[in-house]
């Protein structure tokens, strides 16, 4: 998995940041766009350091591509998104086809995570039709 500064176009990048900021406000910490082979951090809140082991996080979240396939015929319905809860924050991951986004936040409710998920998914789909 490689860090690719040109993986996402500037228009889609701006749309993702806007959609996520609208959904979760100032609790937004970071946004990372990824595919099965590469990733790009498109937003990092100014009070945070860029020294996190992003590659390891992306490798873990990219496992979601396999999860999406594994749950394809679940009696629970289609896989929607993943919300991870940590001591100091939250990770919400959305996968749509061969690309995904995960956002980190200071705090988030289940309702707010659903809202950010819907915002990300609609932005990705709108970006796909604009490509």
Language-model segments: residues:
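Non-catalytic interaction/Regulatory regions outside core domains
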Residues: 1-131
């Amino acid at each position: 998995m490689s860090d690719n500064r040109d993986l996402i176009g500037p228009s889609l990048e701006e749309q993702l940041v806007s959609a996520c900021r609208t959904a979760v406000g100032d609790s937004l910490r970071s946004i990372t766009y990824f595919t099965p082979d590469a990733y790009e951090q498109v937003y990092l809140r100014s009070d945070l350091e860029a020294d996190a082991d992003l590659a390891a996080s992306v490798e873990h979240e990219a496992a979601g591509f396999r999860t999406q396939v594994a749950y394809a015929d679940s009696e629970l319905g289609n896989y929607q998104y993943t919300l991870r809860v940590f001591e100091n924050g939250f990770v919400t991951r959305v996968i749509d086809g061969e690309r995904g986004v995960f956002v980190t936040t200071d705090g988030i409710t289940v309702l707010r995570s659903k809202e950010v998920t819907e915002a990300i998914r609609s932005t990705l789909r709108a970006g796909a039709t604009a490509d």
